[in-house]
Amino acid sequence: MASNPEEKSNDRQKALDNAISQIEKAFGKGAIMKLKQNPVEKIDTISTGSIALDSALGVGGLPKGRIVEIFGPESSGKTTLALHVIAEAQKKGGLCAFIDAEHALDVMYARKLGVNTDNLVISQPDTGEQALHIVEYLVCSSAVDVIVVDSVAALTPRAEIEGDMGDQHVGLQARLLSHGLRKLTSAVSKANCILIFINQIRMKIGVVYGNPETTTGGNALKFYTSVRLDIRKVGAIKDKESIKGNETRVKVVKNKVAPPFREAKFDIMYNEGVSKLGEIIDIGAKLGVLEKAGAYYSYNNTRLGQGRENVKNYFKANKEVANEVEAKIRDLLGNSDNSITMEEESRQLLEEAVF
């Protein structure tokens, strides 16, 4: 006679409870648990400084407790974006560190982006091993919210530095990163911090079909990252003949916390960074937060100015109004991510406004 399914289920539950008890005795309480004992809450994030990119990431910013890679060509805005993340974390009272492996951090530029350099922890390591050890100590302290490593290509192994100029060191940097990331991944999660690696692009030799571009440091970083951002300069912003900034596009090529492959476009202005005011004007007009009639913009029946630059100047002089408009935009975009019942047409309009 077959056993009662209910009795069989109870026996299996008892066996599982016994196994959990043994695991807790061996490794300590909390080593294993049912998910209902530790319910998953909304992902904690830090803003990137760009409304469009925060929306493209799907959770309102970069997720805490994760490793992030920002890569792209030279002068595309990689370090600028990372410094904006630091500035946003500091606004929330967070502590941040910058591992300047390239020895090229412009402190004055960082201040212009809103970074409090007096409270920024900075290190300029001599070798890749030293850099990863410093990162490990900072992560394990659980005191730092954001750590930026600039850049992966500059994490030179000690053997390469101590060797002669013509020596071959095949795969040495890739092995260094692979070993370091194995140790750092769980520590970053437990510390609930964001570890950002800035990376450069190289060209594969002999590639005829497909994309010849690749990033430095091997494949380990691609696997261990939860978010990978491909940042590109797609145009120039001109004022008559002089260039004032760059039109920038960021593609989320990997995302473990939301749907990937979304894109965000925004302006990076020289000596200013990401033009949040420009985003407020463009996205606000598309979402209907700002009223646009020809070249004139209005908000709550108040005319803001004629032309985009004049409206920017108005927002600079009236920061409370700018913050109010930004809050309404973020509220609309936040609802679009979290609302299951939103009509498909409304969701599409919001995505068109941002992406």
From Swiss-Prot:
ATP binds at G72, P73, E74, S75, S76, G77, K78, T79. It is found in: Cytoplasm. GO terms for molecular function: ATP binding; ATP hydrolysis activity; ATP-dependent DNA damage sensor activity; damaged DNA binding; single-stranded DNA binding. Keywords: ATP-binding, Cytoplasm, DNA damage, DNA recombination, DNA repair, DNA-binding, Nucleotide-binding, SOS response. It comes from the Bacteria. CDD domains: RecA. GO terms for cellular component: cytosol. Its main location: cytoplasm. GO terms for biological process: DNA recombination; DNA repair; SOS response. Can catalyze the hydrolysis of ATP in the presence of single-stranded DNA, the ATP-dependent uptake of single-stranded DNA by duplex DNA, and the ATP-dependent hybridization of homologous single-stranded DNAs. It interacts with LexA causing its activation and leading to its autocatalytic cleavage. This is Protein RecA. It comes from Wolbachia sp. subsp. Brugia malayi (strain TRS). The gene is recA.
